[in-house]
Structure formats: C-alpha cells, structure tokens
C-alpha cells in the first residue's frame, strides 16, 4: 500500500479527522539514518504526526516543523512537512538500545525523555508562528494531543504507531488525529471515545491492511462525515549539491583558505536525509574566487 493520508469533516463541521499510512516513508527514514528499533519507532511516530499536522496547511508555500526536545538518549527529533505531502526528519542519536517497556513494547517514552515539544507553522499570510508545550510522556502521540489542546486550544485525540520487525525493518506505520470544535455534541464526543477504544493499536490496524479510509470509518462510526481530500505522502529531501555549495559560500575567508591550503576540500552531510556532498579543493577555491569577484 502506498503512503497517503485522508482528511475528513464530520458532525456538521464540528469534528475534523485525519488518518495516514506511513510505512514506506518511515522505512525510508530508517534506511537513510540507520536507526535502531526504538529510534525507528520514535522517528516514525514523529514523521507521522508531522504529516497529520501538515494536513491542516492550505497553501503550497506553507510548511510545518515539529521539534521534540527531550533529555533522553535520542537527544531530540526534528521533522518538517509541506502542504504537498513531503515529509522528512531525523533523530539526533539513531543508535539507541533500551530495555522494552511493558508488554515488550519499544520504550519510546524513555528514549525521548522529558522536555519540550515545539510546532512551527510557516504560513502564507500570517508568517511564522511557533507554539510549544511540555512533553507529558515522550510517547509523541500523547504529547501532540496535549500540545494541540493546551497551546492551540483544540481538544484532540492523536494515535501514532510503528511496528518494527525482528530484522529492524518497518512492518507498519500510521496514525490518526481527531479534533473537536467547541460545539461538538456530548453524544458525539462519547461516541468518538468509544470508537477510538475499539480501533486499538493503529500500527496493528495498518499491519492488518487497513487503509486510512478504513481507519476513519472505525474512528467515526455513528457520525456523519465526508472525506475531503486524499494526499500522497513521501520522504523526499530538498537538499542538493548546489545548496551544499551555497552553504560553503557562507564560510568566511579564513575558513575557505584553510580548506584550500590543507588540500582537504569540504564535506557536508544533510541532517534530514544523510546525503553526503564532497567538494575538491579546486571547487572550494572557485567558491573563494567567486566571493572575491563580488567584493
């Protein structure tokens, strides 16, 4: 199944619901960053949560960044996404191994630790807005739900899951987000709570072959709703050799001269996708000459 999300509205416009399958992009992140299982689970949940949050963006030029700043051994997670379904991210320390939590689950909460969650929206008309809240569990889904309720004043339920196989590869990943407006009837609130309990593990649902539409059909059982959009999801990266060369041009004259004189050239690694760009001393010298010509 290809990765995608769906966006729906229900209960007379009082309920907004989103569901996504993110197995392929989470596996791509695992492959690029060589993450160990608990880091894979944490990064996959963060990528999925970022994709769901970005589904609220309305302009092709808008983007959203999620930063999980915890004091656990993962040392933080950073993800971003745009309105077109492009999602990317990385974990600071990909090689973390912890004892499993209860029932043998990967201990994402301990790996993330305590700290803060930051969401930055770059909007077409309103500019840049950053909200934040404390991490309540480090499990990502609970932290996002708390953030949305506390910082954005939108009561929300969030479910995120990643199932990792014995070989470390991603078997299934996905999630949902349900947001309630103030006028949501109490009966619909109760029904949603019951439905979410019936859905259970979202990663198990994806592993069993449920599509985003089918996940929403369970979450919104008994509530009139309409699917408004389907959005493909992928893990591309905007880095390029040209952008890396531009980063070298930001070095000062002394640093550039040192790279040329030592004959080492330069090497840059993209944090988001782990791509490595290498430049010879001659290429660095050309950058240096170009800077002098502009002076």
Swiss-Prot record:
One BP term from GO: protein refolding
A GO cellular component annotation in the UniProt record: cytoplasm
Covalent S-S links between cysteines: 237-239, 270-273
UniProt keywords, alphabetically: Chaperone, Cytoplasm, Disulfide bond, Redox-active center, Zinc
Main location: cytoplasm
PTM characteristics: Under oxidizing conditions two disulfide bonds are formed involving the reactive cysteines. Under reducing conditions zinc is bound to the reactive cysteines and the protein is inactive.
One Gene Ontology MF term: protein folding chaperone
CDD domains linked: Hsp33
A Pfam family reported for this protein in Swiss-Prot or TrEMBL: HSP33
Location within or outside the cell: Cytoplasm
Keyword hit for Plastid: no
Biological role: Redox regulated molecular chaperone. Protects both thermally unfolding and oxidatively damaged proteins from irreversible aggregation. Plays an important role in the bacterial defense system toward oxidative stress.
Xref: NCBIfam families: PRK00114.1
Family in the record: Belongs to the HSP33 family.
Protein name, per record: 33 kDa chaperonin
Protein's gene: hslO
């Amino acid at each position: 199944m290809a990765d995608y999300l769906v966006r729906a509205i229900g209960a007379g416009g009082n309920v907004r619901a989103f569901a996504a399958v993110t197995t392929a992009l989470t596996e791509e992140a695992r492959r690029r960053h060589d993450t160990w299982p608990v880091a894979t689970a944490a990064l996959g949940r963060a990528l999925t949560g970022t994709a769901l949050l970005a589904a609220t963006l309305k302009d092709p030029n808008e983007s959203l960044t999620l930063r999980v700043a915890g004091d656990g051994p993962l040392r933080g997670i950073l993800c971003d996404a745009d309105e077109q379904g492009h999602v990317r991210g990385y974990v600071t320390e990909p090689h973390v191994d912890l004892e499993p939590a209860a029932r043998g689950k990967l201990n994402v909460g301990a790996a993330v630790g305590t700290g803060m969650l930051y969401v930055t929206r770059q909007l077409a008309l309103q500019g840049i807005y950053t909200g934040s809240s404390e991490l309540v569990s480090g499990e990502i889904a609970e932290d996002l739900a708390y953030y949305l309720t506390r910082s954005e004043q939108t009561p929300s339920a969030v479910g995120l899951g990643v199932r990792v196989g014995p070989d470390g590869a991603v078997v299934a990943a996905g999630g949902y987000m349900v947001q309630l407006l103030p006028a949501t009837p109490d009966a619909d609130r109760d029904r949603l709570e019951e439905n979410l309990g019936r859905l259970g593990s979202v990663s198990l649902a994806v592993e069993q072959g449920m599509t985003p539409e089918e996940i929403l059909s369970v979450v919104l059982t008994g509530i009139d709703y309409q699917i408004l959009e389907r959005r493909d999801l992928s893990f591309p990266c905007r880095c390029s050799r040209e952008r890396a060369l531009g980063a070298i041009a930001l070095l000062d004259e002394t640093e550039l001269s040192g790279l040329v004189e030592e004959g080492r050239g330069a090497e840059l690694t993209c944090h988001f996708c782990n791509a490595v760009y290498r430049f010879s001393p001659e290429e660095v010298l050309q950058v240096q000459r170009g800077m002098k010509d502009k002076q």
